[in-house]
Regions:
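N-terminal leader segment of winged-helix/HTH proteins
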Residues: 1-34
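N-terminal helix-turn-helix DNA-binding core of bacterial DNA-binding proteins
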Residues: 25-67
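Residues within helix-turn-helix
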Residues: 57-58, 69, 76, 96
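C-terminal regulatory/oligomerization modules of transcriptional regulators
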Residues: 1-5, 128-159
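Short helix-coil-helix linker/hinge
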Residues: 36-41, 70, 101, 125-129
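N-terminal positioning helix adjacent to the helix-turn-helix/winged-helix DNA-binding module
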Residues: 8, 12, 41-42, 103, ...
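Alpha-helical linker/hinge and terminal dimerization helices associated
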Residues: 23-30, 64, 107-126, 142-149, ...
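Charged, amphipathic alpha-helical coiled-coil/dimerization segments
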Residues: 76-137
Length: 159
């Protein structure tokens, strides 16, 4: 008996969390084994900065659909480590923006090959099964459905 598989949707969230934790732990092991001072939890901010070069905390929060407070805490931590800095926005001098420091840019260059390898490894994993190929589309469908009507409302309707 496989506990998680047998319980189906009752443990769907637990399975996703367990899978996510496994991915994060393995990726962090890669960074550590390759002596790269990076934590997978920093990925969203680093990725967005790698694409946009300069962005406000509010824009990051909106892009990631994460609270302003959570992003501010992560930004503060990355600033203390010397990877990013706050600057006057080039778009609007009345606002501040976040950008990489030289140290952050150097770290980005070290982690880009890991991101490429990660994307290849995940693509290979998904290619191992016809069902796996549908997972990203299925996740998007679930996320959209939850945006339309959250899980609390869906459960409460059955009580």
């Amino acid at each position: 008996m496989n506990f998680y598989q047998d319980l189906g949707f009752l443990v769907f969230g637990s399975r996703l969390k367990r899978l996510g934790d496994t991915f994060i732990n393995d990726v962090n092991r890669i960074y550590k084994d390759h002596e790269i001072d990076f934590d997978a939890s920093w990925f969203p901010v680093f990725y967005i900065l790698s694409q946009k070069k300069e962005i406000s905390i509010k824009e990051i929060s909106n892009d990631l659909k994460v609270s302003h407070s959570a992003i501010s805490q992560l930004i503060s931590s990355l600033q203390q480590k010397g990877f990013i800095k706050s600057v006057i926005s080039k778009k609007d001098a009345r606002h501040k923006a976040i950008t990489f420091t030289v140290k952050g840019e150097k770290l980005l260059q070290k982690i880009l090959p890991v991101w490429n390898a990660l994307e290849k490894a995940m693509s290979e994993l998904v290619e191992e099964s016809v069902n796996s190929k549908k997972i990203l589309k299925a996740l998007t469908t679930i996320e959209t459905g939850l945006h339309d009507k959250n899980l609390f409302e869906r459960i409460d309707a059955h009580l």
